[in-house]
């Protein structure tokens, strides 16, 4: 299973963290359904290439382009007198993270009894909650 197109600023310190340790976990909660979904995945970082170029071509014409043109990296100390003027429109810092999903663990909490199942690419099975 593959989950694509998580966009990021390639100057973010988080990118180096993903490259050093690509195992990730995502946790989602839906209050209305009382469902929790945990996803274990492996991240691959793309800083350049045809896919990044294609996404940038679309984003570069939108207000979101400024998010990927900043002269500063996310988390840098903000200095009142320093400029955060965007770089020219050709030097962007857009990247894509692709997540290869290893498994998904679904849990439903209910007064009538909890349910849990684990899904992989080729099977699923009920588990004790």
List the predicted regions and their residue ranges.
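Short, small-residue-biased leader/transition segments that mark boundaries at the very start
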Residues: 1-7
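Mg2+/Mn2+-dependent nuclease catalytic core
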Residues: 9-12
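Short Lys/Arg-rich amphipathic alpha-helical segments
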Residues: 15, 31-35
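Acidic-histidine catalytic/liganding microenvironments
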Residues: 21
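Short conserved beta-strand and strand-loop elements enriched in small hydrophobics
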Residues: 24-29
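Charged, gly/pro-rich active-site loop segments
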Residues: 35-129
């Amino acid at each position: 299973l593959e989950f694509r197109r998580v966009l990021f600023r390639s100057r973010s310190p988080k990118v180096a963290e993903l490259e050093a340790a690509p195992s990730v976990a995502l946790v989602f909660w839906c209050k209305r359904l009382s469902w929790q979904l945990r996803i274990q995945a492996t991240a691959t970082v793309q800083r350049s290439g045809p896919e990044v170029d294609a996404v940038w071509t679309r984003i570069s014409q939108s207000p979101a382009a400024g998010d990927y043109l900043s002269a500063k990296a996310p988390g840098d100390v903000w200095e009142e007198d320093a400029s955060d003027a965007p770089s020219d429109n050709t030097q962007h810092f857009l990247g894509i993270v692709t997540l290869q999903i290893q498994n998904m663990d679904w849990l439903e909490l209910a007064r009538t009894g909890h349910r849990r199942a684990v899904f992989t690419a080729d099977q699923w099975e009920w588990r004790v909650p």
